[in-house]
Amino acid sequence: KGKFVVGVTNARTGKSEYLDGLTDDRKFTASRATCAMPLLFPSIRINGEKYYDGGVADPIPAQHALSDGCGRLILVLTQPKGYRKRLGKQTKAAARLLSVKYPALSKALLERHLVYNRQVLFCEELEKQGRALILRPESPLDSFEKDIETLRQTYRMGHALCESRMDEIKAFIAQA
């Protein structure tokens, strides 16, 4: 039996939490929280706590998947090989605005680029060890893209990437 784990970031603690999406998320509340970017969307309340996108505290939750019992991972990244995240002006501004009410969340935002970059290196090491298969685009993707045609084109690109690597994906799965 498989699992459906939903990663969220607790606004009060700034830490990631992982909820059971099959039993704990019947109303898709946690799933909605995974889309709630601080300041862009309101927080989502679950059991009296406020939550945001899990990617704030744990952008690529590969380590959690391994500690949860997954031996091998297929990782879908949204940026090309060699990409390194930087701390941008908008993130600094968001962190400053959140710092009074949610100091731990503010800190997580300010450290997110460092965490992301470490996690990419960790995933690449897993790939070298044969414990992960990384799928990623050849060119950067904009996480906040709104243009429908661009989104469709991005979807088609991802689909084509998977099709072109299907034999490799099947071989990786067969080794499990």
PLM regions with names:
Residues 1-176:
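Patatin-like phospholipase
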